A protein has these predicted regions:
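Right-hand nucleic-acid polymerase module
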Residues: 1-122, 132-270
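Cys/His-coordinated zinc-finger cores
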Residues: 126-128
Length: 270
């Protein structure tokens, strides 16, 4: 394990056809730990929101493809649930009925769902991402309590970040989201002390000059760079870099395929 006073850590998630990562300093001062500045509630709220969006985006990229479905469910007048508990129970029963339909086809249902209050009318509705295999007419008909609109899950070069932002938002939702237990949970690979300050300076300069794609695509040859950003922390003077990449043979697929990278040993590996 790296034992220096300060080192740079590279944390990488490979989720289907997409990759995202962060490069940031880790401080290991001996003796008494330095006091940390507690973020304001507003800053912490924004950080929590950003982390929730990243978590959900990775989850979708790891489990769903363009063959899967985005579903919007509403209630007709007179069918609206009166409480949060009733809304969750209705959605759970709907998911249970879908599972039986999938099982008859020899398929396993995967899903991510959330329940929302309408911004203007306050009416409850649901958003669901679910695995394909059952025809969309049946999926909509099984709902039976109002309007159901299904469409193919759409990916762009950044994946489903826009959809993840919408679902992961905190306001108007009962809770951020629910998910089935059979989802693949994204794993983080960490590389400690393998990038020195000269490397960080090279990345900063490349981002400033607009040539950052060369550095990242050389490091991860199976992927194309979508975006890379960096900022300086005014308190600890460290440089923080975030990057997003897409597989070169991009298909919108979440099929698990190993990523080809420059040979490195993750931290903690024997």
């Amino acid at each position: 394990m790296y034992t220096g006073r300060t080192f740079n850590r590279e944390s990488v998630y490979v989720c289907g056809d997409y990759m995202d990562g962060d490069i940031y300093p880790v401080f290991q001062a001996p003796g008494k730990r330095r006091s940390r500045c507690k973020p304001t509630s507003e800053i912490q709220q924004k950080l929590n929101q950003k982390n929730a969006e990243k978590k959900l985006t990775r989850l979708v990229h790891s489990n769903f493809t363009e063959d899967d479905i985005a579903l919007h469910l509403t209630y007709r007048p007179g069918e609206e649930p009166q409480t949060e508990e009733e809304a969750q129970r209705i959605l759970s029963n709907y998911i249970r009925r879908l599972k039986r339909r999938y099982a008859k086809l020899g398929l396993e249902l995967k899903y991510i769902s959330c329940t929302e209050y309408g911004k203007t009318n306050g009416k409850v509705h649901h958003h669901v991402i679910l695995s394909g295999g059952l025809d969309r007419d049946t999926i909509e008909k099984v709902w039976g309590l109002g309007y159901a609109n299904s469409k193919r899950l759409q990916f762009n070069e950044s994946g489903v970040t826009g959809l993840a932002h919408y679902i992961a938002k905190d306001k108007h939702f009962f809770k951020r989201w629910n998910q089935s237990r059979n989802l693949t949970i994204p794993q983080c690979a960490q590389f400690d002390g393998q990038l020195n300050m000269d490397d960080i300076a090279d990345i900063e300069e490349a981002i400033e000059c607009g040539t950052q794609w060369q550095w990242f695509e050389d490091r991860y040859p199976d992927f194309q760079l979508v975006e890379a950003t960096c900022y300086k922390n005014n308190i600890n003077r460290g440089t923080y870099i975030h990057f997003e990449m897409r597989r070169r043979e991009w298909s919108g697929s979440s099929a698990a395929r190993p990523a080809r990278m420059k040979k490195r040993t993750p931290s903690g590996a024997s």
